[in-house]
Amino acid sequence: MIEFQHVSKFYKGGKVAVDDINLSFDKGEFICFIGTSGSGKTTSMRMLNRMTDPSKGKILIDGQDIQKINPVELRRQIGYVIQNIGLMPHMTIRENIVLVPKLLKVPVEERNKIAEKMIDLVELPREMLDRYPNELSGGQQQRIGVVRALAANQDIILMDEPFGALDPITRDS
């Protein structure tokens, strides 16, 4: 379970990004934050994976205050698809997909199976696994960003405008 308890985020100059939110999500729930630009959606997700910390309040995962969890360890437990894709340009598509499983010490053979399963999931040819991000279209890169977040089978997956770079035909299929 994820809980936001009276969580607020203030930036310099008094700008309020998130103001006293109280939310609770049970395991297995699919939640969407919908709002205008600047309404705190991204900030809320960034607080959940400790890319930024709340100014006030607590965020709990399974009853544990995330401020007491090492941020690197916390992030290894959370899949995250960011707005601007975020693929590592010096790594192949295979290496990008299995980045977190590698950090989690998953054996190479199993990582290769994961990469193949994930690229099949987004209906891209397996030959693309040995290419680099700059050799793929923006929509293809976005799909790789999504499956990278799924590759380690984490309990929490955060998606911040995950389909922003997809063309409407791909997005609707």
Q: What do these predicted regions represent?
A:
Residues 49:
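Helix-to-loop junction immediately C-terminal to a conserved catalytic motif
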Residues 65-79, 103, 109:
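ABC ATPase NBD coupling module
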Residues 94-102, 112, 116:
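Short helical segment in ABC ATPase nucleotide-binding domains corresponding to the A-loop/adjacent helical element
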Residues 134, 152, 158-159:
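Conserved signature/switch motifs of ABC ATPase nucleotide-binding domains
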Residues 109-127:
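Conserved ABC ATPase "signature" region
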Residues 34-36:
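The feature captures the beta-strand-to-loop junction immediately N-terminal to the Walker
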